[in-house]
Amino acid sequence: MKYAGMPFGLWMLFAGSFQKQLTAVLGYDAATARAITKKAKPQYRQIIRRLPEFEKADRFKMNIVNCAMVGAFILSMPQRPEVDSLTDYYARSMMTKPMQWFCRKSGKSKFTAKDIAAMKATAALKAADRNPYSWNMEFYEYPDGSGYEGRFTKCGICVLMKELGLYDLTPALCHLDYTMSEAGGVTNFVRQYTLASGGPYCDCGYKKKG
């Protein structure tokens, strides 16, 4: 994957937040936080370089790029974080003001015909059959009309985290689904299983609020 474009853009958008939360959540002093960030950047570029390019219709490129970023930061920390503290760190690092706005904007189009068509197209694409760093998903609408579920049988984040030697920390990344759903303001996020915790699949259920 080329660094120019989305990987470069997401570093510019989020690196400052990732650095700030090293102090706010993980307790590193400002100098150490700066040193971790400086070390993480080339690490991030290296991870991005060895990823394949994603197909144009694949909506999950941003997910793998964000995984590469948090992976690079973890590998640059003097001490490996616990899952709980990493969950908090990742959520706070990602939920910048622009990201909160993006979640609210996405929330407005949730459950529209366009949204459902896009979900069905994603399910039909089965991108992970050709790219192990992408996702395969099945799409189910709830029969009572209360929402829908994406059921993932292949997960690019699981593959990359395993390669980085960080697989046990993957649940911290899975939890962002709850945070983003909450920020969107229109759905209750429900989940029974994750692949990262040994489940048969990873279900992402979105139920209409109210």
Where are these regions (language model features)?
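N-terminal, charged low-complexity regulatory/assembly segments
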Residues: M1-M77
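Amphipathic interaction/junction segments at domain boundaries or subunit interfaces
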Residues: V65-G71, L75-L164
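A short catalytic or substrate-binding loop motif that flags glycine-/basic-rich loops and adjacent residues
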Residues: N131, S197-G198
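Hydrophobic, Leu/Ile/Phe/Ala-enriched alpha-helical segments that form helix-helix packing faces
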Residues: L22, M77, K126-D129, D177-M180, ...
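Short, hydrophobic/π-rich interface segment
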Residues: E138-A196
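Short acidic-glycine loop/turn motifs at beta-strand connectors
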Residues: D144, K208-G210
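C-terminal edge-of-domain segments
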Residues: G198-K208
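Short, well-structured alpha-helical interface segments that form or flank functional binding sites
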Residues: A68, L176, G199
